[in-house]
C-alpha cells in the first residue's frame, strides 16, 4: 500500500461517515466516539460527499509535492468530496499549530491537520476534540509496516492513536554527493560509526582540494531551526544524557562547552552564506 493511498484512507476516516458536523482529527468542537464508528465502512464509502480541510506546513519543494499527492489521491478515490489543502508556512509547523488553536477556540476546528508524533499531540488531548484513528491503524496494518518504534511514538498517553505516519523525517543524518568525493579524489569511508577525527580529516581533504567558493559542508538555516537541529544532533551524538540534562535545565557547563566547540568547528567548513538560504535551496545544490 502506498503512502498516497494510506493518506487518502486516513482523510476518509477522519471525515467520519458522510461528514457529521465535522468528524475529524479535530472534530468541530463536538465530542465523538470513534470506537462506536464503523471506520472500515467509512473508508470503503467511495460515494461519500462533503468537504475536508487539510492544514499543514509542507510548502517547499518536494514536501509540497508530497502533500499534494496525498490530497490528489484522496480526490481521485472520493470524487464527491472536496479536499482543501491549507498550507500555513512557518518553520517546522509553529505557525500552523497556532492557527489550529485559534480555529479550535473559534469553534472552527479543521477536519485534519499535520503534527509530529510524540509529545506534540498531547496538548490537543485536553480539548477532547481529537478523533482516534485506532481502526485506521488496524485496517491498514500500519503497525506491522511502520519503522521500529514509530507505533509507540504515535500512541498517545491515553493509549489511543490520533496520528498516522505519512512521511519520514529523520535528523542526525549527513547526505553527501558521491560525485564530489570522486571529483576531488577523497576516499569515502567503507564502515559505519565514523569518528569525529575521520570526519574532520575528510573535511580537511575536501577543503584543500576545492577551489575558492566551494566548501565541504553546506547548510540552509535562514529560518534558524536547521542550525538548532544540527546543534541538537551533535549534543545527542556526544552523549544522550547531556541532551536530556540540557533540555531540563540541569546541564554541566563543561559538557555543553565541548558540544559548542564541536559545533563551532563544523561550521568552519560550511559555506559562509548558509544563513541566507533555506534548507531546500541547499538540498538542491547538494544534488545538483
Regions flagged by a language model, labelled:
Residues 1-53, 76:
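Short, low-complexity disordered leader/linker segments with a strong preference
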Residues 37-44, 60-82:
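Short, polar/charged alpha-helical segment
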Residues 42-45, 132-152, 191-192, 217, ...:
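Short, solvent-exposed loop/beta-turn-alpha elements that line the ligand-binding surface or hinge
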Residues 73-149, 153, 182-185:
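Extracytoplasmic "Venus flytrap"/periplasmic binding protein-like
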Residues 201-205, 246-278:
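Glycine-centered hinge/linker elements that transmit conformational signals in sensory
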Amino acid at each position: 500500500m502506498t503512502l498516497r493511498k494510506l493518506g487518502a484512507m486516513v482523510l476518509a476516516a477522519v471525515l467520519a461517515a458522510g461528514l457529521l458536523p465535522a468528524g475529524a482529527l479535530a472534530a468541530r468542537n463536538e465530542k465523538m466516539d470513534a470506537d462506536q464508528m464503523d471506520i472500515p465502512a467509512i473508508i470503503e464509502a467511495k460515494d461519500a460527499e462533503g468537504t475536508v480541510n487539510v492544514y499543514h506546513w509542507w510548502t517547499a519543494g518536494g514536501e509540497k509535492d508530497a502533500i499534494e499527492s496525498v490530497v490528489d489521491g484522496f480526490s481521485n478515490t472520493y470524487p464527491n468530496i472536496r479536499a482543501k489543502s491549507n498550507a500555513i508556512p512557518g518553520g517546522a509547523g509553529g505557525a500552523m499549530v497556532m492557527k489550529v488553536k485559534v480555529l479550535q477556540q473559534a469553534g472552527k476546528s479543521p477536519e485534519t491537520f499535520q503534527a509530529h508524533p510524540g509529545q506534540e499531540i498531547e496538548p490537543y488531548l485536553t480539548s477532547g476534540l481529537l478523533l482516534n484513528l485506532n481502526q485506521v491503524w488496524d485496517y491498514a496494518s500500519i503497525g506491522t509496516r511502520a519503522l521500529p518504534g514509530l507505533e509507540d511514538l504515535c500512541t498517545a498517553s491515553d493509549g489511543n492513536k490520533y496520528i498516522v505516519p505519512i512521511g519520514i523525517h529523520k535528523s542526525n543524518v549527513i547526505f553527501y554527493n558521491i560525485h564530489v568525493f570522486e571529483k576531488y579524489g577523497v576516499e569515502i569511508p567503507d564502515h559505519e560509526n565514523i569518528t569525529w577525527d575521520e570526519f574532520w580529516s575528510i573535511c580537511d581533504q575536501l577543503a584543500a582540494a576545492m577551489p575558492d567558493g566551494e566548501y565541504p559542508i553546506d547548510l540552509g538555516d535562514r529560518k534558524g531551526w536547521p542550525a538548532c537541529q544540527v546543534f541538537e544532533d551533535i549534543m545527542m551524538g556526544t552523549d544522550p544524557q547531556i541532551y536530556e540534562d540540557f533540555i531540563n535545565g540541569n546541564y554541566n557547563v563543561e559538557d555543553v562547552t565541548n558540544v559548542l566547540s564541536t559545533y563551532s568547528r563544523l561550521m568552519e567548513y560550511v559555506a559562509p552564506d548558509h544563513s541566507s538560504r533555506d534548507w531546500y535551496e541547499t538540498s538542491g545544490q547538494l544534488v545538483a
